[in-house]
Amino acid sequence: MFTLKKSLLLLFFLGTINLSLCEEERNAEEERRDEPDERDVQVEKRLSPNLLKSLLGK
């Protein structure tokens, strides 16, 4: 029983580390892809629907 708990704890620990590393890698890739021009397009996309809603009064 003790070895089973020990094994499960080890698997949980290794899985947590793996998820953490994957998340850091994903965040780094997103930062590399974000160029100033792309950021401007994203802001415009978010701004356009809100601007239309305010102009139309909905």
From Swiss-Prot:
Region Disordered: start-end pairs: 25-46
Q: Which domain of life is it from?
A: Eukaryota
Tissue note:
Expressed by the skin glands.
A GO biological-process term: defense response to bacterium
What is this protein called in UniProt? Temporin-1Th
**Where on the chain is Leucine amide found, per UniProt?**
L56
GO CC terms of this entry = extracellular region
Q: Give the protein's biological function.
A: Antimicrobial peptide that renders both the outer and inner membrane of bacteria permeable to hydrophobic substances of low molecular mass.
Species of origin reads: Rana temporaria
Name the predominant localization: secreted
Annotated signal peptide = 1-22
Q: Does the keyword Secreted apply?
A: yes
Q: Which residues form the propeptide?
A: 23-46
Family membership noted in the UniProt record: Belongs to the frog skin active peptide (FSAP) family. Temporin subfamily.
Q: Which UniProt keywords apply?
A: Amidation, Amphibian defense peptide, Antibiotic, Antimicrobial, Cleavage on pair of basic residues, Immunity, Innate immunity, Secreted, Signal
Cellular compartments annotated: Secreted
Spell out the Pfam families in the cross-references.
Answer: FSAP_sig_propep
